[in-house]
Amino acid sequence: MASVKSRVFAITGGASGIGAATSRLLAERGATAVCVGDISCKNFDELKESMKKINPATEVHCSLLDVTSPTEVEKWVKSIVAKFGNLHGAANIAGIAQGAGLRNSPTILEEGDEEWSKVLKVNLDGVFYCTRAEVRAMKSLPSDDRSIVNVGSIAALSHIPDVYAYGTSKGASTYFTTCVAADTFPFGIRVNSVSPGITDTPLLPQFIPKAKTSDEVKEVYRKEGFSVVKAGDVARTIVWLLSEDSSPVYGANINVGASMP
C-alpha cells in the first residue's frame, strides 16, 4: 500500500471524478491534509462529508480555484504552505473536455479559435501555472521526497483527426511534465504524468455530445477498442506516484487503461 501518511497534498479539480477519487484515497491512506482547488463549489460539501467518514483525522480544505489565473494559483499554493507549513505532493487534475463527432471533414476547418484557446488555457496553461507554483513552494521547504503528478490523456497518443485542441493540450502537457521532471529532480521534487484511458467520470459524456446516455458513450468507445476504466483506477496510480513508495520514479508517463485501441 502506497504510504502518504502524515503528509500534505494539493489537488486541483479535486471535487469530482478522478480528482475526488484521488482526494478520498489520500484520506483513506492517512494523509494529514488534502487541499482541494476546483472551479465549482457544487460538490464541496459532499466531498468533505465522504472524506470525513473515510478518515476523520484527515483535514480537508476546499477552495474555489481558477487554474487559468496564475495569481489565484500562486495565492492558493502559498495559503496551503502558510496553514500547514508543508506541501509534500500535488496532483494537477483540473481539465475540460472537447466534444468529438461534431465537425465535418476536414475537421481542422471547423476547429474554432475560441474553443482552441479555451481548452489550451485550462489543460495546458493551467498545468504550467500550477506546476510552477508548486515547485516554487516545494523548493523553499526543507529537503524531503516531494512529488507532483500532472494528468494527461491517451488522446495525446491516439492521433484522432478531431478534437485537436484537447489532444494537443494533453500532448503538450505530457511533454512539459517530462522536461520539468529533469529540471526539478536534483532539488528532491519528482514530477510525473498519468495518462488515463476512457474513464467513467461526469466528464465522459462531454466527449461524445451526440450520445444520449452515459452507457451509449461507453459503447461507442468499446466498439472502437477502448476499455473503460474507473476514476478509482486512475486515482490509485496518482496516489502511488505521490507516495514515497514510487521514489525515485520521475519523468514517467503512466497509461491507465489502453494506451491505444
Swiss-Prot record:
A GO MF label: oxidoreductase activity
Domain of life from the UniProt record: Eukaryota
Matching SUPFAM superfamilies: NAD(P)-binding Rossmann-fold domains
Active site, per annotation: 166, 170
S-S bridge residues: none
Annotated NADP(+) binding sites: 18, 48, 66, 132, 166, 170, 201
InterPro entries tied to this protein: NAD(P)-bd_dom_sf (IPR036291), Sc_DH/Rdtase_CS (IPR020904), SDR_fam (IPR002347)
Any Gene Ontology biological process: indole alkaloid biosynthetic process
Keyword field contains Signal: yes
Database matches in Pfam families: adh_short_C2 (PF13561)
Pathway recorded for this protein: Alkaloid biosynthesis; ergot alkaloid biosynthesis
PROSITE patterns given in the database record: ADH_SHORT (PS00061)
Record EC number: 1.1.1.-
Signal peptide bounds: 1-20
Keyword annotations: Alkaloid metabolism, NADP, Oxidoreductase, Signal
Similarity comment: family membership: Belongs to the short-chain dehydrogenases/reductases (SDR) family.
Reported function: Chanoclavine-I dehydrogenase; part of the gene cluster that mediates the biosynthesis of isofumigaclavines, fungal ergot alkaloids. The tryptophan dimethylallyltransferase ifgA catalyzes the first step of ergot alkaloid biosynthesis by condensing dimethylallyl diphosphate (DMAP) and tryptophan to form 4-dimethylallyl-L-tryptophan. The second step is catalyzed by the methyltransferase ifgB that methylates 4-dimethylallyl-L-tryptophan in the presence of S-adenosyl-L-methionine, resulting in the formation of N-methyl-dimethylallyl-L-tryptophan.
UniProt name for this protein: Chanoclavine-I dehydrogenase ifgE
Natural source organism: Penicillium roqueforti (strain FM164)
